[in-house]
């Protein structure tokens, strides 16, 4: 079988770079963070420029963490400055290096998601100048995989030179620089980009390109820590592995030889993927990904509330989310027969002494290691495939009431529609056989079913009318009464993309 060559490209601090370019600033020399300051200092930073990261700031931290770290760095600069005094400030890395008397400053840019998507489309069109769409996997708004095996001979270029040519074209077209990884499979090119490229010096344009093959992976990364640096190894996986004496990919590879059963006990069938990656293997190709069709589908959304909500207010927000989910189903011509809801509780339930006394349930740790009440999770079967607003909202309310702890403050909500299928392929409600009996009034039941079907058809016409108006005038062109109640979030979220300002 022909050895394949893959390139992964990641646009460097993409959102932050776009904001710098639009301000006429150099993304490699400007301290800038993309965050919605109007949401308070606890808001998540979507991107941080490389110069600001050099002060030990995480690319996905909270805004208050950025401010705190800059404050600490300025305290250090003041201590080292002549006369222990800072005079003025600058957000430019080059100026800060030249003048130790300047305080570190930075720009806070509110996110503009629609604009970033437009930029991403322009960059994707640059990729299409070199590689056909069937050989590109769009992994995220700022990251792609390319199978360039059949292009190297055409362009008479090495993988490194082709990657550089594409990246420089993106830089010339948009002013955005990038990092690339080259590998003999998708896993290796991703790891080369995520891990190896970070440890090599950038060129004058800020470009880093790293390469890996299977043997290079084993020689260079079998001892790499932490495990969470590797693609698809999250905190949960790493914790389980460390509890069983495995701290590196080399440890996992050795365990797969000596005690493979242990890995399958820990991770089930997912152990096969972990073992492959530990050896630097990845059989999946771009072609296989393009051809994949999942056997089951779901559609869902999640929301982190700006402040802790009571159960009553959270129920309103969940109903709004269910209503939005229904309109997505209708627009795509889909139906569902099952809803899943997850309710995440706020840390204040345990930090407030009065609330803490009332709670006697399970306690877990959140992403930051803080103690919070265990989330509530439940499923509601609808009895038929449907996209009816009434049926789904009623089921959502019933499920919420059944699983929620009414005494706790709520911070997160998730809802998903499971077993989603095309409306045309959905089984009819009366298609199943049933045993007749003497005690059922079938005439009355048939009349009731006909009325229900007529009501659903009338509702469907209204849904389509609403969709038509919203497509033309925007999602807020038609709102429901619940969208105007105190605590409702749908109106604001309709003006967002991915939970951030459009």
Model regions and ranges:
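Gly/Gly-Pro- and Ser/Thr-rich, intrinsically disordered tail segments characteristic of DNA damage-repair
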Residues: 1-277, 282-286, 443-502
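DNA-contacting surface of Y-family translesion DNA polymerases
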Residues: 8, 229, 237-410, 425, ...
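Acidic, metal-coordinating catalytic segment for phosphate/diphosphate chemistry
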Residues: 18, 369-502
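Short, charged/polar surface micro-motifs in flexible loops or helix N-caps
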Residues: 12-14, 38-42, 345-350, 420-424
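Contiguous hydrophobic segments
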Residues: 71-80, 311-322, 326, 408, ...
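Generic "edge-of-domain/loop-turn" microfeature
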Residues: 39, 153, 187, 304, ...
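Residues at or immediately flanking beta-strands
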Residues: 177-179, 340, 414
């Amino acid at each position: 079988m022909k050895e394949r060559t893959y390139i992964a490209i990641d646009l460097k601090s993409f959102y932050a770079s776009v904001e710098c370019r639009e301000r006429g600033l150099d993304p490699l020399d400007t301290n800038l963070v993309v965050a919605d300051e109007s949401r308070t200092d606890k808001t998540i930073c979507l991107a941080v420029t490389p110069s600001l990261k050099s002060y030990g700031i995480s690319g996905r931290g909270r805004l208050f963490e950025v401010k705190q770290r800059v404050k600490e760095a300025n305290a250090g600069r003041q201590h080292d400055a002549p006369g222990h005094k800072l005079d003025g400030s600058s957000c430019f890395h080059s100026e800060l290096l030249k003048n130790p008397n300047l305080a570190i400053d930075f720009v806070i840019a509110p996110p503009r998601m629609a604009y970033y998507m437009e930029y991403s489309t322009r960059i994707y069109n640059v990729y299409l100048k070199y590689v056909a769409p069937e050989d590109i996997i769009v992994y995220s708004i700022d990251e792609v995989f390319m199978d360039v095996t059949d292009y190297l001979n055409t362009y008479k270029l090495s993988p490194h030179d082709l990657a550089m040519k594409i990246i420089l074209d993106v830089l010339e077209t948009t002013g955005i620089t990038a990092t690339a990884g080259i590998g003999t499979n998708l896993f290796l090119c991703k790891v080369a980009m995520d891990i190896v490229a970070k440890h090599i010096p950038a060129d004058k344009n800020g470009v880093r390109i790293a390469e890996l093959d299977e043997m290079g992976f084993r020689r260079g990364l079998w001892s790499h820590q932490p495990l969470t640096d590797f693609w698809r190894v999250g905190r949960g996986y790493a914790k389980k592995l460390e509890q069983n004496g495995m701290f590196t990919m080399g440890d996992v590879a050795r365990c797969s030889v000596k005690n493979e059963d242990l890995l399958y006990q820990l991770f089930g069938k997912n152990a096969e993927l972990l073992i492959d990656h530990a050896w630097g293997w990845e059989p999946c190709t771009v072609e296989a990904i393009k051809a994949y069709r999942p056997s089951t589908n779901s559609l869902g959304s999640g929301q982190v509330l700006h402040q802790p909500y009571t159960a009553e207010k959270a129920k309103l927000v969940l109903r709004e989310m269910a209503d939005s989910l229904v309109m997505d189903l209708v627009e795509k011509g889909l139906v569902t027969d099952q809803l899943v809801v997850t309710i995440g509780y706020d840390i204040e339930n345990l930090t407030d002494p009065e609330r803490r006394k009332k709670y006697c349930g399970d306690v877990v740790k959140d992403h930051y290691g803080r103690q919070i009440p265990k989330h509530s999770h439940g499923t509601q079967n609808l009895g038929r495939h449907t996209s009816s607003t009434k049926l789904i909202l009623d089921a959502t309310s019933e499920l919420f009431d059944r699983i929620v702890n009414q005494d706790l403050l709520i911070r997160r909500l998730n809802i998903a529609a499971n077993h989603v299928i095309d409306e045309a392929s959905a089984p009819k409600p009366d298609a199943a056989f049933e045993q007749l009996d003497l005690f059922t009034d079938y005439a009355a039941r048939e009349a009731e079913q006909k009325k229900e079907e007529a009501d659903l058809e009338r509702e469907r016409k209204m849904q389509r009318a609403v969709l038509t108006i919203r497509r033309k005038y925007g999602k807020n062109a038609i709102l429901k009464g619940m969208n105007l109640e105190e605590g409702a979030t749908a109106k604001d979220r309709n003006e967002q993309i991915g939970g951030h300002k459009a």
